[in-house]
Amino acid sequence: MTELKRRPLPHDFHPPVPSFTVTSEDVPEGGTLKDDQVHAAGNTSPHLRWEGFPAETKSFAVTCYDPDAPTGSGFWHWVVFDIPASVTELPVGAGSGAFEGLPQGAVQARNDYGSKGFGGAAPPPGDGPHRYVFTVYAVDQEKLGPDADGTPAFVGFNLRFHTIARAHLISEYEVPADS
């Protein structure tokens, strides 16, 4: 996928909010995702750590989105919200398997694979590099509103009105045409 064909990020259409810092031991900003975060390989949610968010933050949400998926609407790989404001880090695998690394009270919505939790990168062979946008949202309320059956679109709708700051990391992954 060439730069000219790249689709916008979902929060490009939201009101501007302050930024803060998100880092990861697994998601290299501007680099290539590790196999651990690929659906056909490890399929494991990455480590994420954040800081510098507003003091009035009441909770956090984390998403992983592929705007380049050939669906017309992108592809949501991970949606978790109601992460307590005291939590500033998710360990590797928090959104995978038994979700043992998620803090109490956090809610995982269904991803576009139809399951709750993290679903790794899986671009079609030969479709070029896809961006995987890991976003952490600082939220102005402890409970965002949706429950675990909320769709990514409904969670995103609620985030549109309750995000007070946002940070993201973007990595890419590509499957060659001959795979």
Curated annotation (Swiss-Prot):
Residue ranges under compositional bias (Basic and acidic residues)? 1-14
Region feature (Disordered)? 1-31
Q: Which SUPFAM superfamilies match?
A: PEBP-like
Q: Name one Pfam family in it.
A: PBP
As for family, the record states: Belongs to the UPF0098 family.
What is the official name of this protein in its record?
UPF0098 protein SCO1794
